[in-house]
């Protein structure tokens, strides 16, 4: 009896379906939209920015941080990406100074009013289901702002 050579099966090609974008990639994409909006909204006519907390002039976009009034660690997904909670800051205030919360508060009350700030504190206690749909909707909403 002669043996037939064994044939190895070719692996099936992987399906052509695209994997859904991960939530972490959606978070990053939403954060990029937030930064674009804040930079556009608070840019001076000469193309520079003022640090919201110390008033220093920020020359380059790479040096213009988007700082949080209520830190993202305590504000959750809602305030992490809420445009009312964000302002331009320089590196020194945002990173070295931990966001300069007291000065941020004072300036926010001065420029927007106490009711505005109180509303942000109310939002701090709201929870949202930050799932894929929520991030996708926010990205679409924020893209429309700059168009």
Place the predicted regions along the sequence by residue:
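A boundary/linker detector
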Residues: 1-37, 42, 56-57, 120-147
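Immediate flanking context of iron-sulfur cluster ligation sites
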Residues: 39-45, 78-83
